[in-house]
Amino acid sequence: MTDTTAASAEAAAPPQLGILTQYIKDLSFENPNAPASLSQQGKQPDITIQINVGATNLGGTDFEVMLAIEGKAMAEDKVLFALELAYAGVFRIENVPQDSLHPFVMIECPRLLFPFAREIVASATRNGGFPPLMLDPVDFVGLYRQNMARQAEQQQQSKPN
């Protein structure tokens, strides 16, 4: 097989994504006003959720991708609970063109991690004495585009005139 044949066979290979491991990096659940906060059952709390994605190249084709989830439930001016979860996985990604690698890592990998992180959040809130917090599905394509637009805007603002 010649070099050109090997190169074209490599280019034709389908993208491959392997999950090597996944894990909780950090988990915090605070219930600062318990047991009084647990008696708020009739009132609907104001719940805010923030989800961010980060990735680190571990060398070669291996990437650590982390979902950072922060949630807070408030009733009037009191915190019912505060939750922070950093859930990560190590992925081996092969045969993805370089120009598609960043969106692939930042969209497909978090999409695979999310159901596991969602279950951890639901269990933590349930174990904290509250109804399980079931996170809505996340549009990781939209989140990626939003983050890219924010980065472009920050770069524009930091350029000298």
Curated annotation (Swiss-Prot):
It comes from the Bacteria. The keyword Amino-acid biosynthesis does not apply. One of its GO terms (biological process) is protein tetramerization. Keywords: Chaperone, Cytoplasm, Protein transport, Translocation, Transport. The keyword Metal-binding does not apply. InterPro entries: SecB (IPR003708), SecB-like_sf (IPR035958). It is found in: Cytoplasm. GO terms for molecular function: unfolded protein binding. PANTHER family: PROTEIN-EXPORT PROTEIN SECB, PTHR36918. One of the proteins required for the normal export of preproteins out of the cell cytoplasm. It is a molecular chaperone that binds to a subset of precursor proteins, maintaining them in a translocation-competent state. It also specifically binds to its receptor SecA. Belongs to the SecB family. This is Protein-export protein SecB. The lineage of its organism: Bacteria, Pseudomonadati, Pseudomonadota, Alphaproteobacteria, Hyphomicrobiales.
